[in-house]
From Swiss-Prot:
It is found in: Nucleus. This is LIM/homeobox protein Lhx3. Coiled coil: none annotated. SUPFAM superfamilies: Glucocorticoid receptor-like (DNA-binding domain) (SSF57716), Homeodomain-like (SSF46689). Residues 28-78, 87-141 form the LIM zinc-binding domain.
Length: 398
């Protein structure tokens, strides 16, 4: 703001306030001196001499318009250069009135929007590549550089090592698979190979040895498992054949270690001979047919009972004593016979061919049998309802 200082030379002095003392005279913000000039400049609530109000960058006097940032004052151009949008190529500020180019989020001056390789300024419609550092490369230069890079990264020619050099390196490897630097330098001097070539040869040699050991171990384990599988197959076949032989041999085994039943003694027998038992159960001389076993009666068999040896695995617990005559009881069916066996009925035999025990058992006073042997041809004719004949049976009282 431009102000006029009231002075003695001012014709309209009565219209202005006079300063009564030096303390009332404003101090210039630029030179810190009292302003006694006719015109005073006021910026940011501070007073300035007209000659002290200058741009902080270009030092040009500011008379018409100025821009401030903090305590500094700038002209328009310098203010936008410092605090305005900057060019992505030259990092300089761009005035708001200047025409610019944009590539994504980057802004360029017209003369800065150019290829960094051929320095050709890119016009509207040209194809280009935007690098990560905001630099621009035209399409032709980019493809050329890419092809050159691909050619440079091609496989290099292999280094040829003579037999003498190889022998020297092998001897050194046998002494130390991982030699020190001074040893590699000495080998490089002796063989005439590059230091890097010697180092790579030792690295490859160690890797090869490690791989060979690993392959050898894998082969040993594979052979071991194959042998185990083969041995298991052989043992399985042997086991099967052994089982078959065992089945045949088991079929031929006979229990010959035990003495025959006829040779067993009487020291630990269950029953004594029938001659020592009750007279009612002893057999008479002569061959008599066997009679059916009635309910509650014991009929001796054709062969005598033998005692069983105490040490035999087929031994039974000892009998407390000889058999006593069984008490008489009334049988459920006194004359039950099996006609197809050809044996006479116990109640119909004349008694001449029966032993006293059998005669005694056949003479029981029980109800007559409901079985008929007439019209049925040997099979009993039972009534239609089982209850009609089951109810007539008197249960024995033991």
């Amino acid at each position: 703001m431009l102000l006029e200082h009231p002075g003695s030379s001012c014709q309209n002095a009565g219209n202005y306030t006079r300063y009564s003392s030096s303390q009332d005279i404003p101090v210039c913000a630029g030179c810190n001196q009292h302003i006694v000039d006719r015109f005073i400049l006021k910026v940011l609530d501070r007073h300035w001499h007209s000659k002290c109000l200058k741009c902080s960058d270009c030092q040009s006097q500011l008379a018409d318009k100025c821009f401030s940032r903090g305590d500094s004052v700038y002209c328009k151009d310098d203010f936008f250069k410092r605090f305005g949008t900057k060019c992505a190529a030259c990092q300089q500020g761009i005035p708001p009135t200047q025409v610019v180019r944009r590539a994504q989020d980057f802004v360029y001056h017209l003369h800065c929007f150019a290829c960094i390789v051929c320095k050709r300024q890119l016009a509207t419609g040209d194809e280009y590549y935007l690098m990560e550092d905001s630099r621009l490369v035209c399409k032709a230069d980019y493809e050329t550089a890419k092809q050159r890079e691909a050619d440079s990264t091609a496989k290099r020619p292999r280094t040829t090592i003579t037999a003498k050099q190889l022998e020297t390196l092998k001897n050194a490897y046998n002494n130390s698979p991982k030699p020190a630097r001074h040893v590699r330098e000495q080998l490089s001097t002796e063989t005439g190979l590059d230091m890097r070539v010697v180092q790579v040869w030792f690295q490859n040699r160690r890797a090869k040895e490690k791989r060979l050991k690993k392959d050898a171990g894998r082969q040993r384990w594979g052979q071991y498992f194959r042998n185990m599988k083969r041995s298991r197959g052989t043992s399985k076949s042997d086991k099967d054949s052994t089982q078959e032989d065992g089945m045949d041999s088991d079929a031929e085994v006979s229990f010959t270690d035990e003495p025959p039943m006829s040779d067993l003694g009487h020291s630990n027998g269950i029953y004594s001979s029938l001659s020592e038992s009750s007279p009612a159960l002893s057999r008479q001389g002569g061959n008599h047919p066997a009679f059916p076993l009635e309910h509650g009666a014991i009929i001796p068999s054709q062969e005598p009972y033998h005692d069983i040896q105490a040490s035999s695995p087929y031994s039974l617990p000892q009998s407390p004593g000889p058999l006593q005559p069984l008490p008489r009881h009334q049988p459920l069916i006194s004359s039950l016979v099996y006609p197809e066996s050809g044996l006479p009925m116990a109640g119909q035999s004349g008694g001449q061919d029966m032993t006293p025990g059998v005669r005694m058992m056949a003479a029981g006073n029980g109800p007559s049998s409901d079985l008929s042997t007439g019209s049925s041809g040997g099979y009993p004719d039972f009534p239609a309802s089982p209850a009609s004949w089951l109810d007539e049976v008197d249960h024995a009282q033991f």
